[in-house]
Design a protein with these regions (language model features):
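Residues that flank catalytic or metal-binding motifs in active/ligand-binding sites
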Residues: 12, 45-46, 101, 225-227, ...
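Gly-Asp-aromatic-enriched flexible segments
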Residues: 148-149, 153-421, 425
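A structural supersecondary motif
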Residues: 645-648, 656-666
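Acidic helix/loop microenvironments that form the catalytic cleft of cell-wall polysaccharide enzymes
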Residues: 103-111, 557-565, 750-751
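Globin-like tetrapyrrole-binding proteins
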Residues: 747
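Primarily short, surface-exposed interaction patches in extracytoplasmic proteins
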Residues: 1-32, 38-40, 95-96, 142-170, ...
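Sequence context surrounding c-type heme c attachment/ligation sites in exported
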Residues: 13, 17, 38-145, 403, ...
């Protein structure tokens, strides 16, 4: 009930068209579609006929008995003109088909395995059938597999090294972890912090680090949080100037000639190509470096910054995103979706999930995963730590807290650097695995005879019925009980005289609008009697004798006197044959929905006669379709209508409008309706207007109007226009308000919307 795409169904569709175009003997076509996997390697694709059967319910595995019923019903109606499915609950009321016959066939089909289309409770498609033999698959996969194995070993080695580094960090002496300050951030608030105001004296050595951690608060989730972290080597501040525009100048500002490292400078790092490289980042504001370098003994002032998840065993944020919230100016490092550190690198605020201030750095913890900004000291000396933490998404109603800590283990900074180096060590990318061509198909499954379902209820089981053929048609047992029996079923159906009669009748129906038997799915006692039984038998016998050639059958029918008659009937004919069952004249019929659409495209010159392959479905890994949100799509194409994507639950709009087949059941006879919405289609539909415009553009602008009219009639209606018809069309073009090409397009639309275009007579 989620109506999921069947990605590989195109292979079966193309197989059918190719078989028809090659005039494959029809009995072979039938055998291939039932048991092709046991006949030839190419025959696997043909078994898509069975695999594509309708699935039922929420958990389709629980309702497979309904799928088997659909298969049995379709096999019986399509090839034999028998309503075998009526015997599911009890013996057929009208035809000599028993419930035991039904469950004998049921066992054959239930002993096979079918590709799984996926369903809401059981996930994505599976059990596709490879179209290569194992040796071919091994040859194709071997070079890639060798690379993949090397990549796996390298990844395992990387993870082992990272595990040792995380273990070291998790086992650091708690005494080396000194809290500088911590606070909550109220909704919508900005909380400044300063180690001097907290009367904290911080003396750092190279390799020690200062860590700002933002954590989810209480039972709340997480929030986007703007942060600033400034590490200042302590110096004088005689002129009270502020090196950071975000902090108001006051007694706590530092001398602009002193050295400080600000997280604000990291925003520039996000904006550059170095953003593509995982830390350490060396960006820092080094105002007055020469002076301070001398004061600090000429120490290297390049500090490293890291972004980490701050659980007991810290983990660096390693996933790079160059766009967030649909905005390329929002760039981030993360683990999964969260936690993350991100920046708005634009000079303007970014309106995404909230308004993010320009040129600012943000942290976003996960619901249970704090996130940290780590500064590793390059110097030995006293520092002051200050900055702010601000709720950047007030409307979210989530809360955060933050803490600033000094970690005194000098080697820990080296461990961060080692972790970054490990993560940046290239691992051979084996690339995508070779694509093994697969079919949505049928293969042998678990072999077993079926029990009768009493009154059709799979919970109430009766006697076991051995797999065999229908009793009235011979009742032959299986030659090999260890196999499913599909190969025998294929032979039984393809070799039975009913199969030839049913197919001949269908081809006749395609040409005349109705078959010699007007119930093409039912040749049983409740079906219609043939209007010309001798003709049906003669054509069936010739069909078999020709080697089941469909093309030869078309030639015989189209060369008959009946096919070449006019659809006009005399009064005597109407009196003698009012329903035209004896074919006293050709039965006028409307084109099918597919024929109408294909004719429109053929007239415009836009008909794409190629088969095509799969439709542009979303990747299966992204499917989240449910019974409340099933898959639904309409893919535009100029290919023949038989190549369009068809869904079970929703018909293509054009096919639905013009009485296309029901995708859920065999449709032996198309209904023909004439409704206002069909006229509205020709007035308003963009596709129809585009095709008419394409024809108009092919008309020679220098050709006189009457010649244009004759060209149009020949192209669209395959005949010349009468003088009156030509004049009427010229009058329409003359009266039309608009460009000449638009006027001719309007005239073309009128011809293609006419009854003459839609009917064969």
């Amino acid at each position: 009930n989620t109506d999921r795409p069947v990605v590989n169904a195109w292979r079966y569709r193309n197989w059918v068209f190719d078989a028809m175009n090659r005039d494959m003997p029809f009995d072979a076509m039938v055998r291939h579609q039932i048991a092709g996997d046991q006949e030839t390697p190419e025959g696997i694709v043909a078994t898509g006929y069975l695999a594509i059967a309708r699935r039922f319910g929420h958990d389709i595995d629980k309702d497979m008995y309904l799928t088997y019923e659909e298969m049995i019903d379709n096999l019986g109606k399509s090839f034999l003109g028998l309503t075998i499915g009526c015997a599911r609950c009890h013996d057929h009321k009208y035809d000599p088909v028993s419930a035991e016959d039904y469950y004998a066939l049921y066992g054959i089909l239930a002993s096979s395995k079918y590709s799984f289309p996926g369903c809401e409770p059981k996930g994505q498609p599976k059990d596709m059938v490879p179209l290569l033999v194992p040796s071919q698959i091994e040859t194709l996969r071997k070079p890639w597999q060798e690379k993949a194995d090397l990549a796996k070993q390298a990844k395992e080695s990387q993870q082992a090294s990272l595990g040792q580094a995380r273990k070291y960090l998790s086992e650091l002496d708690p005494a080396d972890r000194v809290a500088i300050l911590q606070a909550d951030v109220p909704e919508g608030a900005k909380v400044p912090f300063d180690s001097q105001e907290a009367s904290k004296t911080i003396f750092v050595r190279p390799g020690e680090w200062i860590q700002l951690t933002v954590s989810p608060k209480g039972n709340h989730g997480a929030d986007s949080t703007m942060v600033q972290l400034v590490i200042q080597a302590i110096g004088s501040n005689p002129n009270k100037e502020n090196p950071n525009s975000d902090l108001a100048a006051n007694d706590n500002t530092v001398d602009k000639k002193s050295v400080f490292w600000s997280s604000d400078a990291l925003v520039n790092d996000f904006a550059t190509t170095s953003f593509q490289k995982l830390g350490p980042t060396n960006q820092a504001d080094l105002g007055g470096q020469d002076l301070v370098s001398q004061d600090l003994g000429g120490q290297d002032l390049k500090a490293s910054w890291y972004y980490a998840e701050s659980t007991k065993s810290p983990e660096l944020l390693v996933e790079l995103r160059t766009s967030n919230g649909g905005n390329a100016n929002i760039r981030s490092w993360s683990i999964g979706e969260l936690p993350s550190v991100f920046a708005n690198v634009s000079d303007s605020p970014a309106n995404v999930w909230t308004s993010l201030a320009a040129k600012s750095l943000f942290m976003h913890p996960g619901p249970e995963r704090p996130v940290s900004l780590v500064w590793v000291s390059p110097i030995e000396g006293q520092v002051r730590v200050h900055g702010f933490v601000q709720d950047a998404h007030p409307a979210a109603l989530d809360g955060v807290s933050f803490s600033v800590e000094h970690w005194k283990a000098p080697k820990a900074g080296e461990v961060f650097e080692q972790m970054a180096a490990i993560l940046q060590t290239p691992i051979l990318d084996p690339g995508p695995a070779p694509v093994i061509p697969e079919a949505y198909a049928t293969v042998e499954g678990t072999i077993a005879d079926a029990r009768v379902h009493l009154r059709g209820d799979p919970e109430k089981l009766g006697e076991i019925v051995p797999r065999r053929w229908i009793e009235i048609l011979g009742g032959d047992p299986l030659k090999d009980p260890k196999a499913s029996g599909r190969i025998e079923l294929a032979d039984w159906i393809a070799g039975h005289p009913l199969m030839a009669r049913v197919m001949v009748n269908r081809v006749w129906q395609w040409h005349f609008g109705q078959g010699l038997v007007r119930t093409p799915n039912d040749f049983g006692s409740r079906g219609d009697q043939p209007s010309h039984p001798e003709l049906l038998d003669q054509l069936a016998a010739q069909f078999v004798k020709s080697g089941y050639s469909i093309k030869q059958l078309h030639r015989w029918i189209m060369n008959t006197d009946a096919y070449r008659r006019s659809s006009s009937a005399t009064a005597e004919q109407m009196l003698a044959d009012p329903e035209n069952r004896l074919l006293s004249h050709y039965p006028r019929r409307r084109l099918t929905a597919e024929e109408i659409r294909d004719s429109i495209l053929a007239c415009s010159g836009n008909l794409d006669r190629s088969y095509g392959q799969e439709h542009p479905f979303p990747a299966p890994a992204t499917w989240t379709f449910s019974q409340h949100d099933p898959f639904n799509a309409v893919y535009a194409t100029n290919r023949r209508s038989a190549m369009m994507m068809v869904q079970r639950q929703r018909r293509h709009p054009f096919l639905a409008l013009f009485d296309g087949a029901d995708p859920n059941a065999s449709t032996p006879v198309r209904q023909t309706s004439s409704v206002p919405t069909q006229a509205l289609y020709y007035l308003n539909d963009p596709f129809f207007h585009e095709q008419a415009a394409a024809i108009a553009k092919t008309l020679d602008a220098n050709e006189p109007g009457p010649a244009k009219v004759q060209s149009m009639y020949q192209q669209i209606l395959q005949r010349p226009a009468s003088d009156a018809q030509a004049q009427a069309l010229l009058d329409l073009v003359e009266r039309y308000e608009g460009a000449p090409v638009d006027a001719w397009a309007a005239a073309i639309r009128m011809l293609m919307a006419s009854n003459e275009f839609h009917f064969i007579d």
